[in-house]
Amino acid sequence: FSYRRVRSTFRKAVNTQEMEKCMQQEITRVALDAMGGDNAPGELVKGAVDAVNGRSDIKVLLVGQQDVVEKELKQYSYPKEQIEVVHAEEVIETAEPPVNAIRKKKQSSIVVGMNMVKQKEADAFVSAGSSGAILVGGQVIVGRIRGIERPPLAPLIPTEKGVSLLIDCGANVDARASHLVQFAKMGSIYMESVMGKKNPTVGIV
């Protein structure tokens, strides 16, 4: 297992033909789980509208129950070409066993959204829904980067000097030393490639 191989694989994963095409078009397609979270779909729809009203280089694909989502959208003014509703009949609740939910609820907003990424119909998937279902779906549907054994959760934490990446923050309760090394390498690559931080420092909490 090498840092160089992970870096190469990561860059290949984000530099697909679809991403290059998207960059040429200057539009990033984000599939958003409109049914995930405590205040769905209202806050999710509001966030999508705020996002597209603030910039022209993204398109939000709101994944959820079409009639409910469209009802929320009616109260806002936004560029119509930048928001699209993708129907998903089912919702995965937080209390549901993640593996069973992903297997059985094929028409849930989480499964539909992740399949859109897998099928190159979206460039990213965002959800505030069941963390367990998102982790399971990420492995089963989207798949892991080669050489990575466990998917971590990695929120950005505000600090006095900017932001830090906390990885992992609860996805794995029995991580081995090798997993921690993988998390550290992924976190370093993310902070450098996405956040623009040169030579990021890695610490153990």
Cite the ranges covered by each PLM segment.
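Short, charged beta->alpha transition segments
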Residues: 112-116, 150-157, 187-193
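Aromatic (phenylalanine/tyrosine) cluster motif
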Residues: 1-3, 10
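Short, acidic/small-residue loops that bind anionic groups at enzyme active sites
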Residues: 136-170
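Ligand-binding beta-strand-loop-alpha-helix segment within the catalytic cores
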Residues: 165-203
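Contiguous, glycine/small-aliphatic-enriched amphipathic segments in soluble metabolic enzymes
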Residues: 10-140, 192-203
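Residue-level detector of flexible, active-site-proximal loop/helix-junction positions
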Residues: 90-92, 160, 173
